[in-house]
Design a protein with these regions (language model features):
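Short, small-residue-biased leader/transition segments that mark boundaries at the very start
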Residues: 1-8
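Domain-level detector of nuclease and nuclease-like folds
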Residues: 9-173
Length: 173
């Protein structure tokens, strides 16, 4: 088969637009561990599990509903924690799903690029100092936000999240 992730082909998962890896590395517990991050065999651990265990801000970021979207399990597994980019002349590998993944970069379909950009802007604004958007990606996301303006579903989604989570996303107005 073309993809080894066949069991994920028909699954839908809630996944991060801004990968946990992208903001997780800004946490000391992710990089270095913490005295409270000891497994049941007495071995120290770090990374996502440690940050999740001991850092409340990390848990807020990881569970922020504005950053969670339904995703095809197979495509999400292949996307991994790759950065978004434009991939010129790429072959379509996922049938009708316009998502390209090449050389550790991912290019979403045009109709959601602005949505992705605004999620990045929101996360960067809501959690400052975490290095969520590079200078290069900021320019790309600004272009995507302009090319794919806010639509009715994006507004409705933000309204629903605000009602549950209690905070406003100023990038979807």
């Amino acid at each position: 088969t073309l993809f080894p992730y066949t069991t994920l082909f028909r699954s839908v998962e809630w996944e991060h637009v801004v990968p946990a890896h992208a903001f997780g590395q800004s946490f000391k517990e992710w990089r270095d561990g913490d005295p409270n991050c000891i497994d049941n065999k007495g071995k120290a651990f770090k990374g996502r599990n440690c940050a999740q265990k001991v850092n409340m801000l990390y848990r807020y970021m990881q569970s922020d509903m504005y950053n969670l979207v339904p995703a095809n399990g197979q495509i999400n597994a292949l996307r991994s924690n790759y950065s978004y980019a434009m991939i010129p002349g790429e072959p379509r590998r996922f049938g009708n799903c316009d998502m390209e993944i090449e050389d550790r970069k991912a290019e979403p379909r045009p109709e959601i690029r602005g949505d992705i950009a605004r999620i990045y802007f929101y996360m960067d604004d809501a959690y400052p100092g975490r290095g969520i958007i590079s200078k290069k990606n900021r320019k790309l996301f600004q272009a995507w936000a302009k090319e794919d303006p806010i639509d009715n579903w994006e507004r409705e989604r933000a309204k629903r999240i605000e009602a549950i989570q209690g905070n406003h996303n100023k990038f979807v107005e």
